[in-house]
A protein has these predicted regions:
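C-terminal motif of bacterial Sec signal peptides marking the signal peptidase cleavage site
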Residues: 13-16
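N-terminal pre-ligand scaffold of iron-sulfur
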Residues: 19-93, 107-108, 121-138
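Sec-dependent signal peptide recognition
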Residues: 1-8
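Short cysteine-rich clusters marking metal-coordination/redox-active sites
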Residues: 78, 98-99
Length: 138
């Protein structure tokens, strides 16, 4: 009888771990670097600015300069059905990003979902800013 309980417990642990990994944005290496005077990031010159950088991450990057002047970066891959790699688009004004496939919306301040069906935030990357360069890495 103990063996049956142990087997059931192992099955429950295995299936619960698999469910946690479902719907996760894949891990890919990200190493974006640009000089601060690069025209691709000129939208970050003032607070509230955001830019889209293609060719990095799963579906590209969004870099946002928050009102407190901190920089944050997110993968554009929506956390709703990430296996589709649906790239979120910037809304106007640049306070949210929308998943065109599901209609979900995400805050650019911290990547959290602000409109269903999203339940998980956008994947966030580390941003490093020096006197001359901005880097987005993981």
């Amino acid at each position: 009888m103990k063996a049956i309980y142990a087997l059931l417990l192992i099955c429950m642990v295995i299936t619960s771990c698999n469910k946690d990994k479902e719907g996760r944005i894949p891990e890919v290496p990200v190493n974006f670097r640009a000089p601060l005077n690069d025209p691709r990031i000129s939208g970050l010159n003032s607070a509230g600015g955001a830019v889209v950088i293609k060719g990095y991450g799963v579906a590209g990057l969004i870099i946002y300069r928050r009102p407190d002047l901190a920089y944050v970066a997110f993968d554009r891959c929506s956390s709703v059905n990430p296996e589709q790699s649906c790239a979120v688009t910037l809304d106007d004004p640049n306070l949210t990003a929308t998943d065109p496939c599901s209609g979900a919306k995400f805050s650019l301040y911290d990547g959290t979902p602000v409109k269903a069906p999203a339940k998980r935030p956008l994947k966030q990357y580390q941003v490093i800013v020096t006197n001359f360069e901005i880097s987005v890495i993981n």
